[in-house]
From Swiss-Prot:
GO molecular function: structural constituent of ribosome
Protein name: Large ribosomal subunit protein bL33
NCBIfam families, per the entry: PRK00595.1, rpmG_bact
Pfam families hit by this protein: Ribosomal_L33
Record organism: Nitrosospira multiformis (strain ATCC 25196 / NCIMB 11849 / C 71)
Protein family: Belongs to the bacterial ribosomal protein bL33 family.
The entry's keywords: Ribonucleoprotein, Ribosomal protein
A GO cellular component entry from the record: cytosolic large ribosomal subunit
InterPro entries to which the protein is assigned, alphabetical: Ribosomal_bL33, Ribosomal_bL33_CS, Ribosomal_bL33_sf, Ribosomal_zn-bd
């Protein structure tokens, strides 16, 4: 079953993306480079819990 997760910016701007992932096939935490519109550059986004 796919679970909702939050990808939070490592730039400290407070910006985040929400997405889903299959916990059975990818049990480890996701770390992706995406665009941060607040910082106006590409930064790493780390998976956190969606509250």
């Amino acid at each position: 079953m796919r679970e909702k997760i939050k990808l939070e910016s490592s730039a400290g701007t407070g910006h985040f993306y929400t997405t889903t992932k299959n916990k059975r096939t990818t049990p480890e935490k996701i770390e992706i480079t995406k665009f941060d519109p607040v910082a106006r550059k590409h930064v790493k986004y780390k998976e956190t819990k969606l509250k």
